[in-house]
Design a protein with these regions (language model features):
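Flexible "cap/lid" subdomain of the alpha/beta-hydrolase fold that forms the substrate-access gate
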Residues: 1-8, 15-20, 27, 39-40, ...
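Residue-level recognition of oxygen-bearing side chains
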Residues: 15, 36, 275
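Structural cue for short, hydrophobic secondary-structure segments
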Residues: 30-33, 57
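Short amphipathic alpha-helix adjacent to the substrate-entry channel of hydrolases
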Residues: 39-55
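Active-site glycine-rich loops that stabilize anionic/oxyanionic intermediates
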Residues: 25, 33-36
Length: 288
């Protein structure tokens, strides 16, 4: 897994950040979602290296082997702004002033915040299986609350930690035949770590509070993404079923939007890596 990649922990303003990086050429950052680590990209990253990119895959703060800051009352220590600053600082440390940026699931919210906060650094932005948090919350109904109940369960204080850490393997399921054994082993190690569980829950708590407020402030100010945006979603997940065309939502946030569905379940990097890598390579090529 990640043959010929370097694995290291980089200190980013006091936040230890675990990262895998390899290849040569324009830099592209891949940000994982919940409850995964950077290992989720193990089938996509080598294909992007072969296509001529430097590929950087960090563990987000609170996840995997990266920093586990103490929770704060306002959840700002686990905000997407804080996580985005980690990624921006990591790329500076690795010598990349500008880069392409890809995020999946919770990593998409970090990528969106990074593109909003540091637009000059992001050449192209690809967001997988997401619409903005504030757009989800503006559309909450019984169907969303039933399917995505974990958003609201995770927001509760204390109870989710007790429930999940009592039997993490039951809460977080995975199939090594689909994920790949090494990816699965890393995922299982992470989800059995109470510090990781707390960090992941704080990610969701920040989402409903400080992250939502930042997005709503962006919209009130008329902020728009100016870099090209690719939105991809899993056809066997429920984003399209819940909201129709996700591109219609993203056009309120970005001036240059394109995208399509991919025949996959939610974890497309593991389930449809070649199709995903092809879509990213086409989008990230200089002529796109």
């Amino acid at each position: 897994m990640f043959e010929n990649f370097t694995e290291e922990v980089v200190d980013v303003a006091g936040a230890p950040t675990f990262v895998r990086h390899g290849g040569a050429g324009p830099a592209v950052v891949l940000l994982h979602g919940h409850p995964r680590t950077s290992a989720t990209w193990h089938r996509v990253a080598p294909q992007l290296v072969s296509a001529g990119f430097t590929v950087v895959c960090p563990d987000l703060r609170g996840y995997g082997r990266s920093a586990k800051p103490a929770p704060t009352a306002d959840h700002s220590a686990h905000s997407k702004r804080a996580a985005a600053a980690d990624v921006a600082g990591l790329m500076t440390a690795l010598g990349h002033e500008s880069f392409d940026l890809v995020g999946h699931d919770r990593g998409s919210y970090v990528a969106l915040r990074l593109a909003m906060d540091h637009p000059a650094r992001v050449r192209r932005l690809a967001l997988l299986d997401c619409i903005p948090i504030s757009e989800h919350l503006a559309r909450v109904n019984a169907e969303f609350a039933t399917r995505w109940f974990h958003w609201f369960f995770f927001a509760q204080s204390g109870t989710p930690e007790r429930v999940i850490t009592a039997d993490p393997d039951a809460w977080y399921s995975g199939d090594p035949a689909v994920m790949g054994q090494e990816n699965y082993d890393e995922f299982r190690t992470a989800t059995r770590d109470p510090a990781v569980v707390r960090g992941m829950l704080e990610d969701y708590r920040a989402g409903l509070t400080v992250d939502r407020a930042l997005e709503e402030s962006d919209r009130a100010a008329g902020a728009m993404l100016r870099m090209p945006l690719l939105a991809l979603w899993s056809l066997r997940d429920d984003l399209e079923e819940l909201y129709g065309d996700p591109l219609a939502i993203w056009r309120d946030w970005a001036v240059d939007v394109r995208g399509h569905g991919i025949d996959s379940g939610h974890h497309m990097a593991e389930e449809a890596p070649s199709e995903l890598a092809a879509a990213l390579t086409e989008f990230l090529s200089p002529a796109s």
